[in-house]
Amino acid sequence: MPTGTHKRLPPGRSARTAAALVAAALALALTSALAAPPKRAAPPYSFAIVSGVIDVPADEPAAQRLFESIARERNLAFVVYAGDIKGAKEACRDSLYTQRGAILDASRVPLVFIPGHDDWVTCNTAAGGGYDPVERLDFLRQTLLADAALPDPGALQITRESEVARFRPYRENARWMHDDVVYVALNAPAPNNHYLTAGGRNGEFEDRIIANGFWIDHAAEYAKRREARAMVVIFEGDPQFDRYERAERFAWLRFNRPRIRDGFRELKRTLVKAAATFRGPILVMHASNAPLATGFLIDRPLHADDGVLVGNVTRVAIGPRHPANQWVKVSVSPARQTIFNVSLQDVPKNLPIPPTLPVVPRDDVPLPQMPEIPALPALPDSSSVAPPLQGDGTTPGGASWPAPPPASGPAPGLPASSVQGTP
């Protein structure tokens, strides 16, 4: 038989063979469909975000009522306390932190605490007790941010940046995932991200922006690998998105008109990079510098260095007029086109005050000032030092808002609208 020719089958046998092949293909397709059912959409849930609830000791009972009101909300998964468990005029004593920590621990809903500027930045003032801010931040890391003595089966499965050897101090930077949405907690306080304009070296600031940049980069890559539905980044300080420093061609001509350096510059550029890595919706939430009329603000203010709008990043600034009696609720519906719905909730006036917690004895003796944490060595690109994601990437142990356009080219799977506000 010549090369390239085939033996012809009888007409009847050819038809029977074709029918058998079609039947086998259908059976294989049916078996595959039964073996790998489509992924079920996650059910809707919500989370609460609060900030600056306690300013003076008299606010403590109201804070307890606030957390009790939040706990009574149906399908509420967790609470994020975005900074300031104390006021600027309160001394940063150990006993005060212990007292406020007990209020957070009493929450019946899992709670994630992010330090704010009054929690450590303003501790060096006379009203704050004249403490070293870096030492007070380290104290918070060892107490309020420490692991529980006993494992809590109902707690969130949180990954902390301190698990990375190079960033051991940064326990406050955290990441967790809930029903296809990745959440990131970050230490970026007001004002101006604790950038110091006085003479000397900004050691704490310089080291922290490296750690923060690494953590956002890694979270974006994590969300991409897990094919997350969305990503939420939460911190305390207002990054002033309308102020975006760009390289100036003749900056040396401005020597007689100095300006304050933008302490959030690196954070904003890291968010631009994260939006290019993870093309799904990214929600950035932070506390407002002043109370807002509706309790929150939704906009899309992030631009790249070339001025192009980063379309998949939406900002939600929270600023209730009465922080001790109002909280911001974010409803999450991963299966819907509009993933997030933001609303302001009031604590019912008839809600009873929970039992008073034991008062921690006052300690008026400040701790000795600690030396500043030494600078971290220069790091390579974060993609080369990111810790490996375990297996499939799991963690260890109203007014409608228009759809955000893509940052650079179409973003596959980007919903027409991802955030909605309810007045």
Regions found by a protein language model. Give the residues of each.
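N-terminal secretory signal peptides that target proteins for export/translocation
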Residues: M1-S14
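Bacterial N-terminal signal peptides
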Residues: A18-T31
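N-terminal active-site segment of His-dependent metallophosphoesterases
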Residues: L34-L96, A228
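His/acidic metal-ligating clusters that form di-metal
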Residues: P38-A41, A71-F78, M177, Y183-V184, ...
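Structural recognition of the beta-strand scaffold that forms the well-ordered cores
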Residues: S46-V50, A77-A82, G87, P110-P115, ...
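Extended active-site neighborhood of metal-dependent phosphoesterases/phosphodiesterases
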Residues: A91, L96-A211, W215, I298-S331
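Binuclear metal-dependent phosphoesterase catalytic core
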Residues: N289-P423
